[in-house]
């Protein structure tokens, strides 16, 4: 049976959405049937992703594959246009993997289980759509629609301040989305051809001033989701009130949507503006790394501490994508994949700990590891992964970003040394606050009140399975990075070449107007 032309991406997107529509009519009194139904849907959709990947995806092809395009509104060339390349495919696989585990992590949810799993399956399809659509207006629509289930999950199943956190989340993201809409309309209607097709838009010759305007708009919108300082304040509040499955999706998938969009649109569609903004991204990345690491020190709430750790790690994505080197861009992509796995594992462990201790305050914990040996081992391994221990994915990703930026010929040596030194400070701070966190949770004197009022039961097989499933790719990528980089290197190398080619032309244009001009200490690379 020849399935070469089968609409894989449409099937992968619509299957969980259609399944979600069936959830309300499933006869179920205690939530057991619907949870197994949701898990089955997640597993089947993930299997479809893996099959489509192995049967139809060519690692060496940097261009869009699995392409589908169906006419929707011909007047403005609006199409149901899908495709996957090296930027999309790894994140689609990551989405299927983490969302399926998040459904399994939601086993303890007993309040309105039908509504919960309905929203989880809607998120599943919506998140994959964000990474697959190749029409800019359609991208805006799925970007917005995907926010609705996140808002509802936060506001219904969150903590005491859930409405505040959910409202702040929707205001930040919806406010940023206005910039996406304005930029999308401007790009689509510019020139003689009206089209929202991303490939068509990428081929338009936008003047530099317009590119800078569009780039700034996209940077604000996607900087909210990544997040970038100072647009980050919604994230600690959202994580502070979310449940464990929502944590896994926030850290594992939603933040990656911002990084993906920056690579796809800011780098891929506005390369000249990216060459100008690159030093700004580098500085913002360093600020993310150091500011969030220092702020994490001061947090006594476990969720907020790890939330700031996530913000710090995403700073490496900004530095990597602004490095103008193949290895740096590849490192940025790997950091997104790595953090998706590590962030999901850490926040799942927060949920496991809270289910047993019913507290998130580090001051009220202590000696937990003495009673729960499996939880002790799981916490320790996940934390070592987060601090970029050699042999784990975070180490490889951060090392690639460091090497990529340090060897970049697009910046002056002085600027490179300063940035590498400052980023290294963040790397040193990470194990300090993570190991300190472990000490307060697992070691030290036992909290007798905690033991008297709550049963400190060790991890059950379901929880061990979830963490083990996340650690397999974390360690696998750490030991053999090519298992991940082979998927996307052809695309990221093409993207890097595109922005590198923009640097010499910009420098020449500027020097023609101002002989002493130096574009943020950029110099024309040898290409």
Swiss-Prot record:
Protein known as: NAD(P)H-quinone oxidoreductase chain 4 1
Assigned protein family: Belongs to the complex I subunit 4 family.
Highest rank taxon of the organism: Bacteria
Membrane topology designation: Multi-pass membrane protein
Enzyme Commission number(s) of this protein: 7.1.1.-
Catalytic activity entry: a plastoquinone + NADH + (n+1) H(+)(in) = a plastoquinol + NAD(+) + n H(+)(out); a plastoquinone + NADPH + (n+1) H(+)(in) = a plastoquinol + NADP(+) + n H(+)(out)
Entry annotated with the keyword NAD: yes
InterPro entries in alphabetical order: NADH_Q_OxRdtase_chain4, NADH_Q_OxRdtase_chainM/4, NADH_UbQ_OxRdtase, ND/Mrp_TM
């Amino acid at each position: 049976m020849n399935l070469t032309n089968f609409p894989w991406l449409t099937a992968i997107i619509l299957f969980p959405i259609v399944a979600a529509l069936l959830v309300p009519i499933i006869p179920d009194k205690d939530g057991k049937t619907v949870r197994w139904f949701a898990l089955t849907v997640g597993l089947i959709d993930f299997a479809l992703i893996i099959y489509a990947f192995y049967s139809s995806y060519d690692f060496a092809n940097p261009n869009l594959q699995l392409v589908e395009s169906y006419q929707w509104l011909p007047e403005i060339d609006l199409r149901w246009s899908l495709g996957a390349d090296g930027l999309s495919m790894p994140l689609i696989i990551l989405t299927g993997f983490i969302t399926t585990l998040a459904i399994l992590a939601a086993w303890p949810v007993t309040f309105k289980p039908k509504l919960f799993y309905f929203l989880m399956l809607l998120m599943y399809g919506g998140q994959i759509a964000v990474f697959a659509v190749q029409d800019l207006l359609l991208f805006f629509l799925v970007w917005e629609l995907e926010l609705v289930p996140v808002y509802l999950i936060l506001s219904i199943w969150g903590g005491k301040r859930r409405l505040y956190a959910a409202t702040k989340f929707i205001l930040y993201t919806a406010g940023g989305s206005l910039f996406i809409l304005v930029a999308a309309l401007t790009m689509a209607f510019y020139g003689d051809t009206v089209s929202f097709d991303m490939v068509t838009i990428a081929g338009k010759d936008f003047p530099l001033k317009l590119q800078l305007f569009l780039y700034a708009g996209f940077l604000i919108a996607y900087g909210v989701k990544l997040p970038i300082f100072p647009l980050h304040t919604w994230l600690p509040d959202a994580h502070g009130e979310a449940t464990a499955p929502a944590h896994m999706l926030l850290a594992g998938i939603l933040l990656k949507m911002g990084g993906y969009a920056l690579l796809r649109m800011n780098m891929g569609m506005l390369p000249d503006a990216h060459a100008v903004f690159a030093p700004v991204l580098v500085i913002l990345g360093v600020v993310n790394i150091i500011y969030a690491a220092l702020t994490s020190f001061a947090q006594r709430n476990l969720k907020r501490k790890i939330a700031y750790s996530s913000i710090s790690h995403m700073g490496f994505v900004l530095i990597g994508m602004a490095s103008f080197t193949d290895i740096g861009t590849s490192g940025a992509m790997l950091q997104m994949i790595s953090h998706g796995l590590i962030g999901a594992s850490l926040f799942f462990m927060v949920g496991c700990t809270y289910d047993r201790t019913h507290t998130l305050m580090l001051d009220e914990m202590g000696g937990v590891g003495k009673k729960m040996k499996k939880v002790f081992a799981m916490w320790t391994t996940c934390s070592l992964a987060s601090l970029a221990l050699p042999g784990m994915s975070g180490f490889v990703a951060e090392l690639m970003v460091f090497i990529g930026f340090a060897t970049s010929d697009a910046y002056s040596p002085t600027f490179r040394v300063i940035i590498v030194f400052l980023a290294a400070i963040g790397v040193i701070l990470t194990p300090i606050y993570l190991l300190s966190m472990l000490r307060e949770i697992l070691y030290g004197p036992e909290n007798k009140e905690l033991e008297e009022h709550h049963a400190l039961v060790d991890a059950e097989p379901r929880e061990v399975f979830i963490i083990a499933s996340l650690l397999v790719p974390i360690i696998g990528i750490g030991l053999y990075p090519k298992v991940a980089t082979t998927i996307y290197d052809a695309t990221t190398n093409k993207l890097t070449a595109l922005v590198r080619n923009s640097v010499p032309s910009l420098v020449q244009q500027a020097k023609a107007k101002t002989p002493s001009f130096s574009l943020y200490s950029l110099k024309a690379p040898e290409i």
